[in-house]
Amino acid sequence: MKQKTIKNKVELVGIGLHKGVPVKMELEPLEVDSGIVFYRSDLGVSIEFKAENVIDTTMATVIAKGEAKISTIEHLLSAIHAYGIDNIRISLDNEEVPIMDGSAIGYCMLLEEAGIVAQNAPKKAIVIKKSIEIVDEKKFVRVEPSERTIFDFKIDFNHPVIRQQHYKFTFSTQAYKEEIARARTFGFLHEVNYLRSKGLAKGGDLSNCIVLDESSILNKEGLRYKEEFVRHKILDAIGDMALLGMPLLGSYISFAGSHKLNHLLTKQILSDEKAYEVVSLEDKVEEAALDYAFLHEQH
């Protein structure tokens, strides 16, 4: 299995979820071993997508270099990771990634439009060798050794539409597009009002977020999946775990996990040499374990 990048440069214009201002985003190919690099075109500053560059995980994952920051990156990174792209430059002329429809499906379509090409170097992956867990009261995130890449997530909300939800996702690109990519971010009406009073969620509305009042959802079209809420948590987790710098080969298990806990988990994994092994994905067994099924791959 080879490293991959996109074939052609693509771009779009959207708005940021929290600041609500227009932003132009361009995706460009990068050479082998470049990794994922963000670029603030308005400031002329590049920011590598690495765990040590994360500065905030309160409402979204935010990375920075000096005064330059980029926020709400997790949905885009989720799609990039799910499509097996190792090397790509993401240029933005403002500080937020466009929110699109609150899910990752728009990014998937953009990546398919760009095309995906194999490069002349082997893809690498992080194989989990022992269990590592981050706990915050009842909440936890954990990775365990596994022959397949699995995301197993549970949530429990005191709300009649959500309540307890559980979803176990065995990773493949096609399954991601069908089962995970269309799950939207969600929030509660009382939280939206509070966030806006703090200058946040200015770009959020029913076109890019599931909004719930005390007893129901306000979106007239309803849900895209029965378990859309927990599926979106998996979407977020896939994007956050991309902070490892290469694909995860192991099981991710969580109850009520968050961006903060995911970030702490990636840092803990990378700080423990006995927790993981970096392997070259040239073995067919390892390749099958990740199952990047590229319907749109071009050579």
From Swiss-Prot:
SUPFAM superfamilies: Ribosomal protein S5 domain 2-like. Its cofactor is Zn(2+). Zn(2+) binds at residues 75, 232, 236. It catalyses: a UDP-3-O-[(3R)-3-hydroxyacyl]-N-acetyl-alpha-D-glucosamine + H2O = a UDP-3-O-[(3R)-3-hydroxyacyl]-alpha-D-glucosamine + acetate. GO terms for biological process: lipid A biosynthetic process. GO terms for cellular component: membrane. The keyword Lipid metabolism applies. Pathway: Glycolipid biosynthesis; lipid IV(A) biosynthesis; lipid IV(A) from (3R)-3-hydroxytetradecanoyl-[acyl-carrier-protein] and UDP-N-acetyl-alpha-D-glucosamine: step 2/6. Pfam families: LpxC (PF03331). One of its GO terms (molecular function) is metal ion binding. Catalyzes the hydrolysis of UDP-3-O-myristoyl-N-acetylglucosamine to form UDP-3-O-myristoylglucosamine and acetate, the committed step in lipid A biosynthesis. Belongs to the LpxC family. This is UDP-3-O-acyl-N-acetylglucosamine deacetylase. It comes from Helicobacter hepaticus (strain ATCC 51449 / 3B1). The lineage of its organism: Bacteria, Pseudomonadati, Campylobacterota, Epsilonproteobacteria, Campylobacterales.
